Amino acid sequence: SGRVRSSPQPFDPLASTASFRIHLRWLPDADGRFTKVNGQLLEEGGKQRVTVRVDGRSLVMDGPAWIARATRSDQFLAVDRHPDIHFASEPFDPQLLRNGGKLRGQLSLRGMERPAAFSLLPTTCARPGVDCDIHVLGSVSRRQFGMTGDRLVVKDGVDLDFRVRLVAPGKR
């Protein structure tokens, strides 16, 4: 094919984070994060794509131990049975990294794949991901991914917050 392809830019796993907030009905919200976040930014034919892979087993929850147990359980993230959380974006214009906007793609969670759209925040640096974070926010419905347990305690929406740094070219 006549497409121009550049080598992928991998995420810097030590500088990239994935965190989330669960909204509880009668208690303060619960925050969590994943300590193993990998991925890459690919360029092909003038468009870019991003793939993100999170190891669900690396889940760390703030707050009481019961929240961590509940979040890891089969009723919620089912991290032991489905440890891979994966997002693959649709191709997008490289200006999206600077200007911000909707980042659309497929999210795989709990062994189920669904369309997802996240908000990519604008950046002010020359090389997004290298000189500053690529910051992505969004929300997913627990119900869409089969997380129907604890509905009396946990609201449906889970807020996601990704901050990505890329390995600088020449430092691989």
Model segments located where?
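Low-complexity, acidic/polar, glycine-enriched regions of mature
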Residues: 1-172
